[in-house]
Amino acid sequence: MLCSEIQIRDPYVVLLDGKYYLYGTTGNNCWGKGYGFDAYISDDLTHFDGPFPIFRPRPGFWADKNFWAPEMHLYRGGYYLFASFKADGVCRGTQILRADHPLGPFEEWSDGPVTPRDWECLDGTLYVDGDGKPYMVFCHEWVQIKDGTIAYLPLTDDLRAAAGPAVELFAASSAPWNNHDDPDGTHVTDGPFLYRTSGGKLLMLWSTFGKHGYAIGYYVSQSGGIEGPWVPAEQPLFDRDGGHGMLFTDKSGQLILTIHSPNDTPNERAVFLPVIDTGDGLTLRA
C-alpha cells in the first residue's frame, strides 16, 4: 500500500538491513479502546507492506485504551518498544516491551509503566548518554498539571525499571512558538526525541500547539547533557498542523524528519521532510 493510505500518528522509523520499519499509533480509533500496535516495512518510504501485528495485549493487561506512540529502539542486542497506555482510574504511563525481532512479538519487559505511577505521563523515549547510561525522557501531561513539562529519569541497565526519581526539565509555556493565547491556559508537551548534531550539540525535539496548529521545534542543552539547562530555538521547525516527530537517516544519507500531519483523525499520515544539520541546530531543506 501507499504511505498516503496508512492512518498513523506519532511515526517512528528505523532503517535496518536496507528496510524502513515504520511504527506509530495505528488503528482507526486511537482515542478509545486499544487493540495493540502494528508496523509497516518499506524499501522507499512510499510503498509499504503490512500491517504486521507486533503487540497484542495479554488477557489481564493493565491498560485497555489509548495505546499510543510506540518507538522501537535497538539496545544491547535487543529490540525494545517504548509505548504509552491508559486505563480508567490509572495514570497514563510509558511501559517498556521487548522482542527478539523488529516485528515482534513484543512482550512486557518492565513491570507496568516506568514513569511515575501518580503522574499522567506519555511519549517516553530512550536516550543513552556517552557513557552508555540509559534514560527515559517523557512528558508530564497537561491534563494533570495544565502547563505540560518534559522530564527524564534514569533507567536500570537492563531497561526493566527506573533507577532514580524523575526530574522535570522545562514547561511547554517556555517555548516562544507555543500558543500563549490559549484562553484556558493549557500548554501541551508531546513526543520528545533526542538528537546529537554533527557539531556535538544535544537537541531535544518535541511538539506543542502554536499559533497555526500543531507544531514541532527543538531545545538545545547548554551543558551537552540530559540535565540541561535547555534553551529553545526561537522558531519551530514545522508549525502548520503537524508534529510528534523524530529524525532518521535514509539510504542516501539524507537526514529526515518524520511527523504526522494533519493532526486530525482520521486524516493523519506520516510525512517525511529533508532536514539540514547545521552543527548548531536544524533547518528544513527548502
Give a label for each model feature.
Residues M1-A286:
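Carbohydrate-active catalytic/glycan-binding domains of CAZyme proteins
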